[in-house]
Amino acid sequence: MATWSNFNLQNSASPLMEQIIFFHDHTLVILIMITILVGYLMISLFFNSYINRFLLEGQMIELIWTILPAITLIFIALPSLRLLYLLDELNNPLITLKSIGHQWYWSYEYSDFQNIQFDSYMIPINEMKNNNFRLLDVDNRIVLPMNNQIRILVTATDVIHSWTIPSLGVKVDANPGRLNQTNFFINRPGIFYGQCSEICGANHSFMPIVIESISIKNFINWINNYS
């Protein structure tokens, strides 16, 4: 989850998020290099006294400043396209989770198991415990097994919502009458927080998402106890 004075992305909990962080750093390096180059040229032109009143065209310099930006864009576009296709790829998910957005809470259904569905509301401030996080904890967490491919189906019943877990690199719009899907792979145990990322009304800020990642053995025990 995000913490105070954290200017970076959240710590990765999935391979896709690691790739997103790598692409962010890769693009940022290119932007810094461009900024330094342009800044150096502007400062050098400002302080030198070279002029050429008879310069009407320069095919070579025009060729250079056309080819170099094109090459730079290719270095950004290729890893971006690779990552885009990785985010859309589904690889034999172990379980399917269905998430339904409401004003202003989430409900979940484990489609592979019978009678496992629940609503997830934010814990009000006056009911919080010492180990709860303000505006982030819920009464019913999503429990999922780590080190397994998971598919999530997302929809809504009223307005557009967005199901988002930053540390997993997942953000899916929940549209009424439409079923969107994506997949993720949690590679470590822990509790991961997210929030609705689409303005959906007065209490938009009060519909958090919490995933509890556990081992497959504990997940099976949870399924049996819930049933």
UniProtKB/Swiss-Prot annotation:
Keywords: Copper, Electron transport, Magnesium, Membrane, Metal-binding, Mitochondrion, Mitochondrion inner membrane, Respiratory chain, Translocase, Transmembrane, Transmembrane helix, Transport. It is an enzyme of class 7 (translocase). It is a multi-pass membrane protein. Binds a dinuclear copper A center per subunit. The chain crosses the membrane at residues 27-51, 63-81. Gene3D superfamilies: 1.10.287.90, Cupredoxins - blue copper proteins (2.60.40.420). Its cofactor is Cu cation. Pfam families: COX2 (PF00116), COX2_TM (PF02790). The keyword Mitochondrion applies. Cu cation A1 binds at residues 161, 196, 200, 207. PROSITE patterns: COX2, COX2_CUA, COX2_TM. Component of the cytochrome c oxidase, the last enzyme in the mitochondrial electron transport chain which drives oxidative phosphorylation. The respiratory chain contains 3 multisubunit complexes succinate dehydrogenase (complex II, CII), ubiquinol-cytochrome c oxidoreductase (cytochrome b-c1 complex, complex III, CIII) and cytochrome c oxidase (complex IV, CIV), that cooperate to transfer electrons derived from NADH and succinate to molecular oxygen, creating an electrochemical gradient over the inner membrane that drives transmembrane transport and the ATP synthase. This is Cytochrome c oxidase subunit 2. It comes from Choristoneura occidentalis.
